[in-house]
């Protein structure tokens, strides 16, 4: 399948550069995955689309301030490091710039020596394995010295780093935020709970591959980056109870979707406690096994994320919805507006 089938025209001014002042004031497009019908709402209207017995699945990963600026100890040359994945102990898979200056044995110093890293291995596209040394607690030092790794399409400086975290972020380890969750406030989540909507939490640590474009000409040639996920026994039991009682499982974001669909695929359609690495790639033709609805942002043209949404809601429906979003001047990407995709006609008949 040609990746150009997932292209659409997006004016640059619709790429949201900063978050809205209030999280829940973003707009919400409601898309019926079966009919393609569209409604234009605000995010707080999600309350009227979710019912007692439904369950929202939220990714409680926390974004690391994963971008570090340091200098080579021997020459003083500036080096930028982006942490991608913790491998073992203090060893990390990273991206460095300029990569040609960092060879095996190179030592990089950050914060006037408060944190140091030695290159222990190299990979393609600027990939380097670094082993860190420090006194104290690594994540406290990282919090002091690091910057939030905003996506490349965001050019503005983020004034408040908490705005690139969900209000329920807990498990540190992501190089990017699960952005569909950025729309929720603690007050909105409380209102949903009061209505009888269950909240379930999983963890998937978002990797930098989220921003990497599909370089292959066809979908089938593309290989997804692997990301670590975890679902507890408590969450699995809750989701199974929801299913048994006729409720719907609504994932907040593509990361929650990938987690549930990975587990269901690996366990004959069942949801159970599991941890591991997933490189699942969902595109039209994929049959969903776990979810009934999806809350997600508006994604990049030709991205694996728009392919996932197209697998769930039909490519023609999704591209029509995206063209409507452009026409109605919705805000796109990480700090943009949201879409709620489900079989809404069936839902209204409940």
Curated annotation (Swiss-Prot):
InterPro entries found in the cross-reference section: QueA, QueA_dom1, QueA_dom2, QueA_sf
Q: How does it assemble?
A: Monomer.
Q: Which family does it belong to?
A: Belongs to the QueA family.
Reaction(s) catalysed by this chain's protein:
7-aminomethyl-7-carbaguanosine(34) in tRNA + S-adenosyl-L-methionine = epoxyqueuosine(34) in tRNA + adenine + L-methionine + 2 H(+)
Cellular component, GO, one term: cytoplasm
Q: What keywords sit in the KW lines? A: Cytoplasm, Queuosine biosynthesis, S-adenosyl-L-methionine, Transferase
* UniProt pathway: tRNA modification; tRNA-queuosine biosynthesis
Q: Name the cystine pairs.
A: none
Report the superkingdom from the record.
Bacteria
Q: What is this protein called?
A: S-adenosylmethionine:tRNA ribosyltransferase-isomerase
Q: Name one GO molecular function term.
A: S-adenosylmethionine:tRNA ribosyltransferase-isomerase activity
Task: Tell me where it resides.
Answer: Cytoplasm
User: Could you tell me which species this protein originates from?
Assistant: Bacillus cereus (strain B4264)
Which top EC class is named for this enzyme in its record?
A: transferase
**EC number(s) recorded for this UniProt protein:** 2.4.99.17
User: Is Protein biosynthesis given among the entry's keywords?
Assistant: no
Q: What is the lineage of its organism?
A: Bacteria, Bacillati, Bacillota, Bacilli, Bacillales
- Protein's GO biological process: queuosine biosynthetic process; tRNA wobble guanine modification
Biological role stated in the UniProt entry: Transfers and isomerizes the ribose moiety from AdoMet to the 7-aminomethyl group of 7-deazaguanine (preQ1-tRNA) to give epoxyqueuosine (oQ-tRNA).
């Amino acid at each position: 399948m040609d990746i150009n089938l997932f292209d659409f025209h997006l004016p640059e001014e619709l790429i949201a550069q900063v978050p809205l002042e209030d999280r829940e004031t973003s707009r919400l497009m409601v898309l019926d995955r079966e009919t393609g019908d569209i409604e234009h709402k605000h995010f707080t209207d999600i309350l009227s689309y979710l019912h007692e017995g439904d369950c929202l699945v939220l990714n409680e990963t926390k974004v690391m301030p994963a971008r570090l600026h340091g200098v080579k100890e021997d020459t003083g040359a500036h080096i930028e490091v982006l942490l991608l994945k913790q491998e073992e102990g203090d060893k990390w898979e990273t991206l460095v710039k300029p990569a040609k200056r960092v060879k095996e044995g190179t030592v990089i110093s950050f914060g006037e020596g408060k944190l140091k890293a030695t290159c222990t291995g190299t990979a393609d596209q600027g990939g380097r394995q670094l082993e860190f040394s420090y006194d104290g607690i690594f994540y406290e030092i990282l919090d002091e010295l690091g910057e939030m790794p905003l996506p490349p399409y965001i050019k503005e400086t983020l004034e408040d780093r908490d705005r690139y975290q969900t209000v329920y972020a807990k498990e540190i380890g992501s190089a990017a935020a699960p952005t569909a969750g950025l729309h929720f406030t603690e007050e909105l989540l409380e209102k949903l709970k009061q209505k009888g909507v269950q909240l379930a939490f999983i963890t998937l640590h978002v990797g930098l591959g989220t921003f990497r474009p599909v370089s292959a000409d066809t979908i089938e040639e593309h290989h997804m980056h692997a990301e670590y996920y975890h679902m507890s026994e408590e969450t699995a039991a809750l989701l199974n109870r929801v299913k048994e009682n006729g409720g719907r499982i609504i994932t907040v974001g593509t990361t929650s979707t990938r987690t549930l669909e990975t587990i269901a695929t690996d366990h004959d359609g069942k949801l159970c406690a599991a941890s591991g690495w997933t490189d699942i790639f969902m595109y039209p033709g994929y049959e969903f096994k776990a979810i009934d609805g999806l809350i997600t942002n508006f994604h990049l043209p030709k991205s694996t994320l728009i392919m996932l949404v197209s697998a769930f809601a039909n490519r023609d429906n999704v591209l029509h919805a995206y063209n409507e979003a452009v026409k109605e001047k919705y805000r796109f990407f990480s700090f943009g507006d949201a879409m709620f995709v489900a079989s809404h006609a069936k839902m209204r008949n409940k």
